[in-house]
């Protein structure tokens, strides 16, 4: 699949290191949690979750994202997708808990809106380093209860999302969706396993992608052969039992590295 050339229509600075890029194309058939391959000309092609059907939200962490931060309204980049398996939408009347850490709030925000539109009750645990880093807080607040945690205590609970989670009756929720740094997700995974509600949970994983369509195998996890780009990026908690979640990732050569 050749990249679709899109033009930037608006750039919103969410924080000093996070920006949302709106573009002149809508992926009307996207499933919340799916990703696109973003082609930054002359640099690289990298996977990113969609924060709306016409936007990506980018954290400046490397060469490709740094180059994106140099772009202005009217500039263009390439997109392939959407790819992969998204989050499972709830049924009317179900109670959903979202657990987002940092920029992991980006793919969870359209899921929250879709879940609410489907008639579900949506609650969110939103974690970040400080109050100014709580991404899309207003979008989640518009849909239901929100619980914040910050590393520095500038808003909500001082600590991590797990500190908030420990105080909730997780058994009362029908579905739990998690996205954020893998160390955070691994901590949430262990807590949900202890509470015996892992079968209700889905986790969005990030791995090094090359093709994005399940051919090259660069993003396979463990010995299971599960491909993050094709079988995921969203996996059920049961699928991840005994996996390398929170322990290992892989570099561009496919070598397993400690997280």
Swiss-Prot record:
Record domain FAD-binding FR-type: where: 1-89
GO biological process: 'de novo' UMP biosynthetic process
Superkingdom field: Archaea
Molecular functions per Gene Ontology: 2 iron, 2 sulfur cluster binding; electron transfer activity; flavin adenine dinucleotide binding; metal ion binding; oxidoreductase activity
Record InterPro entries: Cyt_c3_hydrogenase_gsu (IPR012165), Dihydroorotate_DH_ele_sf (IPR037117), Dihydroorotate_DH_Fe-S-bd (IPR019480), Dihydroorotate_DHASE_ETsu (IPR023455), FAD-bd_FR_type (IPR017927), FNR_nucleotide-bd (IPR039261), OxRdtase_FAD/NAD-bd (IPR001433), PyrK_electron_transfer (IPR050353)
Keyword ATP-binding: no
Binding site for [2Fe-2S] cluster: 211, 216, 219, 229
Listed cofactors: [2Fe-2S] cluster; FAD
PROSITE patterns from the UniProt entry: 2FE2S_FER_1 (PS00197), FAD_FR (PS51384)
Iron-sulfur is among the record's keywords: yes
Keyword vocabulary terms for this entry: 2Fe-2S, Electron transport, FAD, Flavoprotein, Iron, Iron-sulfur, Metal-binding, Pyrimidine biosynthesis, Transport
Function: Responsible for channeling the electrons from the oxidation of dihydroorotate from the FMN redox center in the PyrD type B subunit to the ultimate electron acceptor NAD(+).
Subunit structure: Heterotetramer of 2 PyrK and 2 PyrD type B subunits.
Protein name, entry field: Probable dihydroorotate dehydrogenase B (NAD(+)), electron transfer subunit
Annotated organism of origin: Methanosarcina acetivorans (strain ATCC 35395 / DSM 2834 / JCM 12185 / C2A)
Lineage: Archaea, Methanobacteriati, Methanobacteriota, Stenosarchaea group, Methanomicrobia
